[in-house]
Amino acid sequence: MVAVAVMGAGSWGTTMTKVFADAGNTVRLWARRDEVADEIQSTRRNQCYLPGVVIPDAVTATSDPRVALTDADIVVLGVPSHAVRDSLTRWRDFLPDDALIVSLPKGLERDTARRMSEVIAEASGRPSEKIAVLSGPNLAKEVADEQPAATVVACTDHDSAKRVQEACTTAYFRPYTNTDVIGCEIGGVAKNVIALAAGMAAGQNLGFNTAATIITRGLAETVRLGTALGANPATFSGLAGLGDLVATCNSPLSRNRTFGEHLSQGMSLEEAQEACHGQVAEGVNACRAIQSLARAHSVDVPIADAVVSVCFDGATVKESIMNLMERDTKAE
């Protein structure tokens, strides 16, 4: 049993709180809003972000980050990618010296295109062997409902990955370890962008052929980019690559897919965000960073380019699909 601090009470942070508690650990859950922490503590529910799920008694909720972080062996970051640097900068003095930090958000820093593990290292001063990434086909509601799922815990230090793995293994949640942090992070980021494209196609009532094409060619550009950044190509055929991509592109529970559908139906970014209960899909924040990384490494990412054109350049989904189909023919 270890002491776990989960920093962020959104749907995924709350779900992983339940997983760590069900694995036999004591867990403190930090919520940014006082009322969310109070509701969890008094009712064992988080109706705003994870309705209908009972939060175990082993969980203590608080809105005080110092209280949440005190004596934690594992610190799980559940804040959105755009908030990671500022949050860790504020919490740096409270972080226990020996704690492992586990990253949940699947995004890139908007201005720098840095991966979350890189941002965490810079903001916390921790070495890479103390920073892990959790990534895989993990839709929060399904995991919270204890439907069988698997994931990947990636860290450059296998022993650290093993510690996190042991702390979050339950009868319904099976983590595997990996030392390819770059591959697991790029797989998690890119699939959000590809899922936006899949949602856009679904919003146009396009069928399975189109969906399969987007997933397959999306995987191809993810492998190209990841390999250029130093990832192991084999990672992308595993849970943190293909597994996550398939789940996120196909499920109606996927925020990125749903967001893409809204955009395809003519909504603006602001309207789509409102339709998604005020939450922006990570793929919207990541698509330009993916494009920037790809250009810096001379990698072709046509689907990501198409998503950028719809989200930020005023292109319609139909125009973007036509542009993709009219590209020069080539070998697969």
From Swiss-Prot:
Matches recorded under PROSITE patterns: NAD_G3PDH
Keyword NADP: yes
UniProt GO BP: carbohydrate metabolic process; glycerol-3-phosphate biosynthetic process; glycerol-3-phosphate catabolic process; glycerophospholipid metabolic process; phospholipid biosynthetic process
Molecular function terms, GO-annotated: glycerol-3-phosphate dehydrogenase [NAD(P)+] activity; NAD binding
Keyword NADP: yes
Family annotation (InterPro entries): 6-PGluconate_DH-like_C_sf, 6PGD_dom2, G3P_DH_NAD-dep, G3P_DH_NAD-dep_C, G3P_DH_NAD-dep_N, NAD(P)-bd_dom_sf
Gene3D superfamilies attached to this UniProt entry: N-(1-d-carboxylethyl)-l-norvaline Dehydrogenase, domain 2, NAD(P)-binding Rossmann-like Domain
Cell location: Cytoplasm
Reactions the enzyme catalyzes: sn-glycerol 3-phosphate + NAD(+) = dihydroxyacetone phosphate + NADH + H(+); sn-glycerol 3-phosphate + NADP(+) = dihydroxyacetone phosphate + NADPH + H(+)
Primary localisation category: cytoplasm
Gene Ontology CC terms: cytosol
Active site: 191
Pathway where this protein functions: Membrane lipid metabolism; glycerophospholipid metabolism
Keywords from the UniProt entry: Cytoplasm, Lipid biosynthesis, Lipid metabolism, NAD, NADP, Nucleotide-binding, Oxidoreductase, Phospholipid biosynthesis, Phospholipid metabolism
Origin: domain of life: Bacteria
PANTHER family (alphabetical): GLYCEROL-3-PHOSPHATE DEHYDROGENASE, GLYCEROL-3-PHOSPHATE DEHYDROGENASE [NAD(+)] 2, CHLOROPLASTIC
Purpose of the protein: Catalyzes the reduction of the glycolytic intermediate dihydroxyacetone phosphate (DHAP) to sn-glycerol 3-phosphate (G3P), the key precursor for phospholipid synthesis.
Similarity annotation: Belongs to the NAD-dependent glycerol-3-phosphate dehydrogenase family.
Protein's name in the database: Glycerol-3-phosphate dehydrogenase [NAD(P)+]
Biological source species: Corynebacterium kroppenstedtii (strain DSM 44385 / JCM 11950 / CIP 105744 / CCUG 35717)
Gene designation per UniProt: gpsA
